[in-house]
């Protein structure tokens, strides 16, 4: 049996959808409030998306299109991939990594779940 701390009690397909949604929201809004476990799971994926944005090749755009949700963002009516490549990636052009930070915040009132604020640096 797996370690209970590593089992998230959901299937892989569900987690893939949640991660895609959270990463897309993080890139569009700059920060999101979620549970600590989810924040830890999406940190590496968000940083990979920003690294793809820094490459700015056709192949990297296609990889980002494959992962990010294609929803119109609330920022200048651009979709999330275009916003990633045109606005977010140039900010981090000279940064080698560490594009996100996780800040632990007060536990959620209803079920006392550990909460965190994940934001772009």
Curated annotation (Swiss-Prot):
One of its GO terms (cellular component) is cytosolic large ribosomal subunit. Keywords: Ribonucleoprotein, Ribosomal protein. PROSITE patterns: RIBOSOMAL_L17 (PS01167). InterPro entries: Ribosomal_bL17 (IPR000456), Ribosomal_bL17_CS (IPR047859), Ribosomal_bL17_sf (IPR036373). It comes from the Bacteria. GO terms for molecular function: structural constituent of ribosome. Belongs to the bacterial ribosomal protein bL17 family. This is Large ribosomal subunit protein bL17. It comes from Metamycoplasma arthritidis (strain 158L3-1).
